[in-house]
Amino acid sequence: MEEFIIKIAGTKGISNFKSYHFSIISNYENFFNFILPKDVKDVLVVLPFDEEKTKTIKHAITNARSNVSVTIMYSGKIRDEMIIGWRT
């Protein structure tokens, strides 16, 4: 992951980074409802650049956890996966 992403995550207090391959996810809303803690406050998602996937993922997170702040960042180092971190 790029250094600037790590710095931004640190300023937001976000940790617990995990990587998930897109092929394992059939329903994004169910996926986020399962992996995100109920008391999550901030979520940082690192994606390969894809506007449609970005909209889909942001919508799914806000549907799964309505009171969460979502930050989406892009990385040229990843292709078929997303990296997710959060703060409770």
UniProtKB/Swiss-Prot annotation:
Lineage per the UniProt record: Viruses, Adnaviria, Zilligvirae, Taleaviricota, Tokiviricetes
InterPro entries: DUF4898
Gene it is expressed from: SIFV0027
Protein name per the record: Uncharacterized protein 27
Domain of life: Viruses
